[in-house]
Design a protein with these regions (language model features):
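Conserved catalytic core of nucleotide polymerization and phosphodiester-bond processing enzymes
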Residues: 1-281
Length: 281
């Protein structure tokens, strides 16, 4: 429907209505139903719902509070710390791409992270063969879509839909990416091959994810299984790392008798309600 918005103004109005209706029903009205007598909202975290191992949140889902749109930011403002406290937000930057670099051993991707470069601009520079400082916003956006898409085993068709380009051009982006980072291609191929042989993948911490789809008699189901095999070790390891971080942060806060406390986990991000006098510690 989004593709029709430019040609038919009413479509844009319908999409805007849907967005506002979602914000109102799910957040403006929905969250108010979960406020307890203390004025707080408590979510429920689940360890075993997602296949990747990530924590999920329900009743209400506090991992999905909108942030990108201006109205979403206003909704976030209803959450505030206790008097004298403040929120400290810490996250693992580009954790899945960093894990891809580590697990594949691709020197170029590793070097880009070691130099603390804008990873999407770095990829665009290499894939499109232009100097780093001359990468355009469009080239960076395309490289970003490829960077994240590769982790999820994106197809040329899927990338073409994301970027609104032809399938042939999208395939060219993917081919150029693998020419730039050959060890990533090798890693993904080997990961899928091992998963087909064993029927499962492992995270770096040894957690197993069975992938029965790889032995399906249905071609589309097998393709889905291959995409799962590519992504599961990366996203699963990221999930393991953030859980370990949660334990370590909690234990240190207790051990050092801090008043600060861990109050929320949003995938690769931790939110701590921090006492003003403890914020530098």
């Amino acid at each position: 429907m989004e593709k029709l918005a430019g040609d038919y103004p009413i479509v844009a109005d319908i999409l805007e209505y849907r967005k506002l209706s979602k914000l109102k029903s799910t957040y403006a009205d929905g969250l108010s139903n979960f406020i307890d007598a203390t004025g707080k909202i408590h979510t429920t975290f689940h360890q075993t719902i997602t296949a990747t191992g990530r924590l999920s949140s329900t009743d209400p889902n506090l991992q999905n509070i909108p942030i990108r749109m201006e109205l979403g930011k206003m909704i976030r403002k209803v959450f505030h710390p206790m008097p004298g406290d403040l929120f400290v937000d810490s996250d693992y930057s580009q954790i899945e791409l960093r894990l891809l670099a580590h697990m594949s051993g691709d020197e170029q991707l590793i070097e880009a992270f070691r130099k603390n470069q804008d990873i999407h601009r770095s990829t665009a520079s290499k894939v499109f063969h232009v100097p780093f400082d001359e990468v355009t916003d469009l080239q960076r956006r395309n490289a970003k879509a490829v960077n994240f898409g590769i982790v999820y085993g994106i197809s040329a068709y899927g990338l073409s839909q994301d970027l609104n380009i032809g399938t042939k051009e999208a395939q060219g982006f993917i081919d150029s990416y693998f020419e730039t980072y050959p060890k990533i291609k090798e890693f993904l191929d080997n990961t899928v091959a091992q998963a087909k042989e064993k029927g499962y993948t492992r995270t770096l911490f040894g957690r197993i994810r069975p992938i029965p789809e790889l032995s399906s008699g249905n071609f589309m189901t097998r393709q889905f299984g291959e995409r799962v095999a590519m992504n599961a070790p990366i996203q699963g390891t990221a999930a393991d790392i953030i859980k370990i971080a949660m334990i370590r942060v909690h234990d240190r806060l207790i051990r050092e008798h801090f008043r600060s406390r861990l109050i929320l986990q949003v995938h690769d991000e931790l939110l701590i309600e921090t006492a003003e006098e403890e914020k530098e510690k």
